[in-house]
UniProtKB/Swiss-Prot annotation:
Keyword Membrane: no
Disruption phenotype: Only abolishes the production of pleosporalin A but not of the 2 other final products.
Principal EC category: oxidoreductase
Protein name per its UniProtKB record: Short chain dehydrogenase pgmD
MF terms (GO), sorted A to Z: oxidoreductase activity, acting on the CH-OH group of donors, NAD or NADP as acceptor
InterPro entries tied to this protein: NAD(P)-bd_dom_sf, SDR_fam
Species this chain originates from: Aspergillus terreus
Length: 312
């Protein structure tokens, strides 16, 4: 079946693509990570940093002079490459940055116990910001709009990669984040605007469902630990020509891949650099103007916006 082109500028209002009047395809000056300096010892974990959005998120935290960066991926060669690039970038900031790597299958709980051990042994159990960026667009049978034609194993893998791993990350790593030495207490879950979609010929159902579950989990996690200062935000990273997107999306949908891969990283740093309890449990788009978003703070909190609910 031919895939239709997708024009996000004509998206329904409830998708929230234009929640701020101003939108961006590249980081604006006000969220430039290079203008940020995190406190001494600041420790960041980026799960799924071997390429694409995750790689650029890690780069943004290096630009912001986070002292410790731990990156994970399934592929060791990707981690080796990204580590070298991060270390080169760190030299340009004039601040020493320790980059550590862990080969990890984000769908397996034992991967997170290993990550916890790494943080305990190498970083005094400190974890300030956790970015869950594992995920990916489905391939194979999952692009069919007919559920009966999908492969069960491909379906389960897609859900595990785009959602279940975030549960494992929270279960094993949140206890570290609640310790006194972990000052940032921030989780960013990389979601997708696809969580709004229901048409299987535009985005696979398993991907939409996985990201929708991630959004609700973000809200639940934020509410669970609000009294302990944990801030949890779901971020749509924009639509970027990442290796994953280009490799999984039909060519007819490549027209929407126009956002800079570094945009999401800049927004993640913006979330981390200051306590923003008012956006905890909510969904935001990296393409939004963050100054405009902050100006809507009272409206967002009063009307409890940017959360999933049923229209009745």
């Amino acid at each position: 079946m031919a895939q239709p082109e997708l024009d996000l500028s004509k998206a329904p209002a409830h998708w929230g693509m234009n929640f701020t009047e101003t939108t961006h395809q590249q980081p604006s000056r006000s969220i430039d990570p290079s203008n940020v300096t995190f406190p001494q010892g600041y420790t960041v974990v980026v799960i799924g940093a071997g390429k694409g959005i995750g790689e650029h998120i890690a780069k943004a935290y290096v630009q912001a002079r986070a002292e410790n960066i731990i990156i994970t991926s399934r592929t060791g060669s990707d981690l080796d490459r990204v580590k070298k690039e991060l270390e080169t970038l760190a030299q340009q900031t004039g601040q020493a940055v320790k980059v550590s790597t862990l080969v990890q299958d984000a769908t397996k709980p034992e991967s997170y116990t290993k990550l916890k051990d790494l943080l305990e042994e190498g970083f005094n159990g400190r974890l300030d910001t956790l970015v869950f960026c594992a995920g990916g667009g489905p391939v194979g049978t999952l692009w069919t709009p007919r559920i009966d034609e999908t492969d069960v194993d491909e379906w389960n893998e897609s859900i595990a990669l785009n959602f279940t791993g975030s549960y494992y990350a929270a279960k094993y790593l949140v206890p570290l984040m609640l310790r006194p030495q972990s000052q940032g207490k921030t989780i960013v879950n990389i979601t997708s605007a696809a969580s709004h979609f229901t048409g299987g010929n535009i985005t696979p159902a398993s991907y939409s469902i996985g990201k929708l579950a991630l959004n609700r989990f973000t809200q639940i996690l934020g509410e669970n630990y609000a009294d302990q200062g944990l801030v949890v935000v779901a971020v749509h990273p924009g639509s970027s020509p990442t290796p994953g997107a280009l490799g999984s999306m039909p060519p007819s949908l490549h027209n929407i891949l126009t956002d800079d891969q570094g945009l999401c990283g800049a927004v993640c740093v913006w979330i981390s650099k200051k306590k923003r309890e008012w956006i905890s449990g909510r969904y935001i788009c990296a393409t939004w103007d963050m100054d405009e978003l902050e100006s809507k703070k009272e409206e967002i909190v009063k009307e409890d916006k940017l959360k999933w609910r049923m229209a009745v």
